């Protein structure tokens, strides 16, 4: 039974590698955070370890009200995809750079579990 599970895990790892090389979105998770580029702040992210998930895409969509008012608020979307199984913490910091200083206005830590089949599960948000 252990041998079969080991072989299955190896096959899944190979398939995930092929999927990643081809850029096919299969096992992804999305994070949506409020952002106001007019304020000078933007979201930055970092992983506590590499090789578990990677950024697949990010884009910003302004709110309809902010377009009309010119205040610039909207939503920043981050889509991550699985690379390998394991646990990973993604830290998001809402930062602004001014006068050689890095100012962090807000931060969140998302903890994910990626299973042996590439499924991504959000475990917690701090």
Task: For each feature predicted by the language model, list its residue ranges.
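Positively charged n-region of N-terminal signal peptides that target proteins for export
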Residues: 1-4
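Hydrophobic alpha-helical targeting segments used for export or membrane insertion
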Residues: 12-23
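Extracytoplasmic soluble-region selector
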Residues: 21-126
């Amino acid at each position: 039974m252990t041998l079969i599970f080991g072989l299955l895990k190896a096959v899944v790892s190979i398939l995930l590698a092929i999927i990643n090389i081809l850029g096919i979105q299969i096992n992804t998770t999305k994070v949506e955070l409020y952002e106001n580029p007019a304020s000078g702040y933007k979201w930055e992210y970092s992983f506590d370890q590499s090789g578990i998930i990677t950024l697949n895409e990010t884009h910003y969509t302004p709110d309809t009200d902010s377009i009309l008012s010119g205040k610039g608020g909207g939503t920043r979307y981050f889509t991550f995809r699985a690379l390998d199984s394991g646990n990973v913490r993604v830290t998001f910091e809402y930062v602004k750079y001014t006068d050689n200083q890095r100012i962090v206005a807000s931060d969140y830590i998302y903890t994910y579990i990626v299973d042996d089949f590439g499924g991504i599960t959000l475990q917690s948000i701090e």
